[in-house]
């Protein structure tokens, strides 16, 4: 969970969300992480961020376009590494099957 513009947000990844992300990035998630050493391209980072973003305690996902804009602002204000770490930590938490035996 993290705070941005005085609101609480969280990421929620699932197999269904990953399928959507992989359609957009045209790259399997594990291949993307391995290929980049976990340092996703800005385009891919914005995609993972936006497709998994929810306001805290909400049942619905945040609008994707607004999520991409938020990601861009956070990268500019807090730094790429901070944002990438938030996304990867949530991915590890929600989809541990990607990281078994690694």
Language-model features, listed with the residues they occupy:
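Residue-level signal for threonine
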Residues: 14
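Charged interaction scaffolds used for protein-protein
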Residues: 1-5, 19, 23-43, 59-102
């Amino acid at each position: 969970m993290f705070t941005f513009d005085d609101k609480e947000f969280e990421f929620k990844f699932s197999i269904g969300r990953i399928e959507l992300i992989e359609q957009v990035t045209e790259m399997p998630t594990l291949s993307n992480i391995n290929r980049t050493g976990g340092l996703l391209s800005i385009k891919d980072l914005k995609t993972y961020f936006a497709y998994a973003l929810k306001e805290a305690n909400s049942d619905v996902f945040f609008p994707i376009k607004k999520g991409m804009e938020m990601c861009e602002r956070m990268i500019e204000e807090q730094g790429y590494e901070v944002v990438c770490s938030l996304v990867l930590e949530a991915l590890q938490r929600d989809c541990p099957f990607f990281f078994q035996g690694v």
